[in-house]
């Protein structure tokens, strides 16, 4: 192999290794920031990872909202009409949050029936429902 070819091969291998390392770092960084979506049924079945930041969506169950006498703590249940989980949240709830409302909560699973939310998102108007919640609920109605 001539010195010119050897040098080109070395440069090519070096460039490929740098690109591979950069791609690996990007994928690692993206993995840290991904919030996967789960339904209450998937959480009850144990499919959701514990102690990882995820999203859960469903409908707020009737007569399930319990507010603390002092502070901003609130506890409520969300359902996908098959299973129900208890969500605890400390903070100000959105103005549109109410019973029978479709919501998405971000936070961590504490066990198979409890979820600690760090953020609660409610739908915007009477016709809007988060796409993940809509498809998950549609799947339950079909069954």
Curated annotation (Swiss-Prot):
GO MF term list: heme binding; metal ion binding
Family annotation (Pfam families): CcmE (PF03100)
Residues in compartment: Periplasmic: 30-143
Localization of this protein: Cell inner membrane
Domain of life: Bacteria
Membrane topology recorded in Swiss-Prot or TrEMBL: Single-pass type II membrane protein
Residues that coordinate or bind heme: 124, 128
Alphabetized UniProt keyword annotations: Cell inner membrane, Cell membrane, Cytochrome c-type biogenesis, Heme, Iron, Membrane, Metal-binding, Signal-anchor, Transmembrane, Transmembrane helix
Xref: SUPFAM superfamilies: Heme chaperone CcmE
Function description: Heme chaperone required for the biogenesis of c-type cytochromes. Transiently binds heme delivered by CcmC and transfers the heme to apo-cytochromes in a process facilitated by CcmF and CcmH.
The family this protein is said to belong to: Belongs to the CcmE/CycJ family.
The name this protein goes by in its record: Cytochrome c-type biogenesis protein CcmE
Lineage, uppermost ranks: Bacteria, Pseudomonadati, Pseudomonadota, Gammaproteobacteria, Legionellales
């Amino acid at each position: 192999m001539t010195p010119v070819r050897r040098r080109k091969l070395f440069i090519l291998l070096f460039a490929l290794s740098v690109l591979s390392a950069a791609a690996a770092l990007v994928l690692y960084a993206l993995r840290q920031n991904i919030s996967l979506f789960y339904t209450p049924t998937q959480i009850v079945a144990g499919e959701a990872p514990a102690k990882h930041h995820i999203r859960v969506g469903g409908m707020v169950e009737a007569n399930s909202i319990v507010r603390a006498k002092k502070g901003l703590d609130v506890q409520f249940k969300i359902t996908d009409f098959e299973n129900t989980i208890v969500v605890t949240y400390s903070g100000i709830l959105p103005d549109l949050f109410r019973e029978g409302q479709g919501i998405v909560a971000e936070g961590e699973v504490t066990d198979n029936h409890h979820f600690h939310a760090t953020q609660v998102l409610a739908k915007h108007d009477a016709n809007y429902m988060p796409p993940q919640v809509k498809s998950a609920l549609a799947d339950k109605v079909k069954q």
